[in-house]
Amino acid sequence: SSDLDSASLIAKGKHLDFIIQDSDLNKLKSFSYYSSMISSDIKPNLKLGCIVKLDDNYYLCIQPLCDTERIPQKDEIKDNNPHKFLFVSVKSNSQMDFFVKSSDKFIGMRVDYSSITVMPVFGNENGVVPLNDNKYILYDRKELEYIACLKPMFAQKIANNFAANISRVGIDQFEWLRLKGRE
């Protein structure tokens, strides 16, 4: 049996495990981060894939792209009924969906599909929610701190997983019939 380096694979049952040395872990986190995030030079309007922070909580915007434009300005909102954006919570976790960068450290984040938040917004004269001084301003004047933005396909994958999760059909079926139907 020979020694294995960090790129070696070991077959165990029906899956493969990577052996990763600690010295390579930060490189992998960095590669994952830069593969899934848009450039930090781009400061996007609030849209699908934007990761924001409110108080000590992180959120991922899953509002469909087509619903992130033509947002009424604050003085155009009638009956105190502003446009609303949909977010899911993301939390620091060892089982991560993506990484965010904070103070030159990469933090693994996991989407919590069961924690949905709706936030009221208003648009500017161009009908979008712009980024100003690294913050998005909500209808109630709360400020969302901009953290990063996922590339469109990564964000769409998460939005699709969210939609699949909430669109499951649950019925109250007799157990004997449910089991009989599988035979």
Feature roles, as predicted:
Residues 92-183:
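C-terminal terminal-subdomain/extension
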